[in-house]
């Protein structure tokens, strides 16, 4: 089980990313634009640098919904490999069966 503070920090980051996604993407578009002037590009870069670090999507890390475990995360199920194995063996995940051939 992950620390509650680590899970809370990750949730806070997700909210910040979601709230600032539109503004950040517009600034990035201007900074990479071929038609914008150099001054506009520089202003966009400065504005991006002034934004909080936690608003950047790269700082997000996927965590298990049940335990908060940051490693061994399965995207399709949004849980860790350990929780997946336990739930699959107990038949709690629909459509998942143990392989046999």
Curated annotation (Swiss-Prot):
The keyword RNA-binding applies. InterPro entries: Ribosomal_uS14, Ribosomal_uS14_bac/plastid, Ribosomal_uS14_CS. The keyword Phosphoprotein does not apply. It holds the Pfam family Ribosomal_S14. It comes from the Bacteria. Part of the 30S ribosomal subunit. Contacts proteins S3 and S10. Belongs to the universal ribosomal protein uS14 family. This is Small ribosomal subunit protein uS14. The gene is rpsN.
